[in-house]
């Protein structure tokens, strides 16, 4: 006993010895478990890790793309950072469709949050809990832990903040369609992908039970995907490969009964992509036997049937199914809706921010990713102030030189101006001043200036709800906070047109780096900057390299690539676990 006590003290003082001892024990076939538990000392550690500090407290809600990218770059020597999330990991969500069919394992695409924050040279507090309410007036968030339910009254807690970062993503939007919540699968979380994987196997197992009619087998093996966006299309492609590369080999008696259908309310699938990609995807799905029903809207879902309306004819169709995956629309989480009501945004569908990601209607609260949308200010709302600021000599007219002097600030503050100039192929400021007949003008009055910019706001577009947008926003916000004091004294943003001075920071600017659409059969489509489109087998290898490089850690990168190799050699696993 004394020997164990001495050994315990040595291992506690020299952690490297304990690691070496564990390694040696495992390598020789033994198993050593060394642990020290002291509740009281644990409480003291928590107290010591939370000293009174003059650092501003930043509370981050969410560990998705926006929250994680913010945590990786924020200066924790300047801020007391605390993170609240109901999941203690980051998930590489673009690979969720691959998880549904076993191409990639679930644990290969997740990285524990504590692994991410421990790499920072400082301390970030993480609380595995769900946010229940935001109180912007008192600058507090109310949270509830989903663990330790036996500790009555100790699951709820609140945190005060100086700055709040809301990066909680979105939940599924059913558009109040009857039966969707009860009968459909979703694909937003890792758990969703795992449930889909089990259900696919269940459908096949049910279909080989003796005594079933052909109609019953066809119904069980009819897989329906509602939504023809990137998630729905990629899942349909993954499922097709899983079925025809793996499952038909072990369920050969029912291979002729399998059917995959994609229901899309729009005229084409992948309608946010280039038309060439959309057309290529539809043609490939047709060759693969995947049915694409465009121009159809689902009106209700029962336990065995989907009811949909064909827009062109107005006819209602009843479709039997074995499994439905709902992959369309994003909705707002309940506590975010409550927060929106508090800040006067109750009529909006999604949380509104300005171009600096600040939530409108309150101070010191920022929102990133799918839970928010940038409410870009319109040029025509400030047209008089812009004209007055540009008219330096107060002549009542604006010369080309005066306009050119403020054009850079206008483009930064109102990015739709730059889009308008490019789309209209207007190379210089003077091109905006041309009259209706195309003649050049040296100067314009306020009415002429309004006419010149009257169509600019038509170029405004909402940012897509993608991981790429959220990640860039998280990085942008962290860099703004890191340079807060510097930019307060030396502003680097565009000029204030309605007042004097400049904005402290440049507004957020999204840089589209391209998007992929895996289409199955080791083929993919890519849309990259510069109107460059690529489709086929070579694009699939580009997809592999990009997605491997974008993994959050070397551990997940190794696991994901290993899963791809395993699938090529051994195929996908069909076990129901």
UniProtKB/Swiss-Prot annotation:
This is External alternative NAD(P)H-ubiquinone oxidoreductase B1, mitochondrial. SMART domains: EFh. It comes from the Eukaryota. Keywords: Calcium, FAD, Flavoprotein, Membrane, Metal-binding, Mitochondrion, Mitochondrion inner membrane, NAD, NADP, Oxidoreductase, Peroxisome, Transit peptide. Residues 378-413 form the EF-hand domain. The keyword RNA-binding does not apply. It is found in: Mitochondrion inner membrane; Peroxisome. It comes from Solanum tuberosum. The gene is NDB1. The keyword Membrane applies.
């Amino acid at each position: 006993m004394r020997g164990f006590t001495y050994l315990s003290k040595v291992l506690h003082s020299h952690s490297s010895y304990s690691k070496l001892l564990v390694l040696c024990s495992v390598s020789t076939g033994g198993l050593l478990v060394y642990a020290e538990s002291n509740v009281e000392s644990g409480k003291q550690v928590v107290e010591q890790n939370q000293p009174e500090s003059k650092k501003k407290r930043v509370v981050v809600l969410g560990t998705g793309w926006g929250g994680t990218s913010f945590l990786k770059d924020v200066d924790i020597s300047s801020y007391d950072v605390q993170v609240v999330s109901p999941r203690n990991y980051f998930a590489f969500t673009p690979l969720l469709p691959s998880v549904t069919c076993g191409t990639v394992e679930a644990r290969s695409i997740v990285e524990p949050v504590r692994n991410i924050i421990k790499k920072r040279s400082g301390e970030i507090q993480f609380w595995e809990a769900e946010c229940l309410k935001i109180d912007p007036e008192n600058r507090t968030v109310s949270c509830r832990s989903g663990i330790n339910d036996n500790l009555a009254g100790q699951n709820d807690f609140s945190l005060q903040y100086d700055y709040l970062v809301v990066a909680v993503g979105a939940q599924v939007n059913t558009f109040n369609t009857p039966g969707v919540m009860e009968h459909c699968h979703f694909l937003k979380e890792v758990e969703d992908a795992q449930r889909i994987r089990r259900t696919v196997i269940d459908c096949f197992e049910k279909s080989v039970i003796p005594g079933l009619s052909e109609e019953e087998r066809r119904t069980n093996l009819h897989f329906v995907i509602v939504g023809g966006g990137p998630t729905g299309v990629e899942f349909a492609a993954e499922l097709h490969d899983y079925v025809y590369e793996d499952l038909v080999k072990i369920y050969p008696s029912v291979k002729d009964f399998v059917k995959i259908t994609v229901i899309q309310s729009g005229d084409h699938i992948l309608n946010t992509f280039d038309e060439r990609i959309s057309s290529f995807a539809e043609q490939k799905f047709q060759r693969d036997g995947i049915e694409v029903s465009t121009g159809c809207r689902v009106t209700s879902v029962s336990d065995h049937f989907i009811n949909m309306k064909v827009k062109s004819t107005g006819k209602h169709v009843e479709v039997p199914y074995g499994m439905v995956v709902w992959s369309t629309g994003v909705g707002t989480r309940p506590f975010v809706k409550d927060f929106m009501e508090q800040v006067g945004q109750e009529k909006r569908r999604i949380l509104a921010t300005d171009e600096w990601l600040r939530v409108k209607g309150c101070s010191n609260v920022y929102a990133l990713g799918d839970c928010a949308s940038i409410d870009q200010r319109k040029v025509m709302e400030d047209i008089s102030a812009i004209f007055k600021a540009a008219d330096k000599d107060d002549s009542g007219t604006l010369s080309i030189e005066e306009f050119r002097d403020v054009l850079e600030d206008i483009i930064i503050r109102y990015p739709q101006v730059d889009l308008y100039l490019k789309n209209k192929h207007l190379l210089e400021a003077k091109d905006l001043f041309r009259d209706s007949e195309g003649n050049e003008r040296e100067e314009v009055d306020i009415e002429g200036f309004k006419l010149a910019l009257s169509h600019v706001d038509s170029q405004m577009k909402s940012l897509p709800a993608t991981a790429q947008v959220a990640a860039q926003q998280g990085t942008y916000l962290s860099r703004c906070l890191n340079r807060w004091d510097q930019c307060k004294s030396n502003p680097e943003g565009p000029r204030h047109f309605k007042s004097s001075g400049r904005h402290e920071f440049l507004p957020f600017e999204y840089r589209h780096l391209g998007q992929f659409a895996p289409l199955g059969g080791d083929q993919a489509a890519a849309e990259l900057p510069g109107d460059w489109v690529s489709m086929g087998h070579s694009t699939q290898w580009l997809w592999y390299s990009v997605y491997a490089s974008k993994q959050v850690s070397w551990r997940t990168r190794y696991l994901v690539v290993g899963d791809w190799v395993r699938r090529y050699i051994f195929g996908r696993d069909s076990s129901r676990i």
